[in-house]
Amino acid sequence: MWSANLAFEIVFDPEALKDLKKLDSPIQQRLIGFLKQRVATLDNPRDIGEALAGSKLGNYWKYRVGDWRIICAIEDERIVVRVLRIGNRREVYR
């Protein structure tokens, strides 16, 4: 969880932490760096994300980092980006 000098706080759900720990360290660092440097510093994290379509995923956003996807819920009232899942683009939506 990060919030110092950032517009939005990044919070990981337990499932997302499990996803992250399964990845190699360089990939973990790349994804964490993206969240810290690109997403958390924005006044509106929707500016670089993409809304997910569909009944189950309609309220969520995705961020693309190479072949990896970060699925998030943006909670404006709490100024939080909640990371729900992290995974390869072929598997993360299952």
What are these regions (language model features)?
Residues 70:
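NAD-dependent ADP-ribosyltransferases
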Residues 87:
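Residues forming the ATP-binding cleft of Hanks-type serine/threonine protein kinase domains
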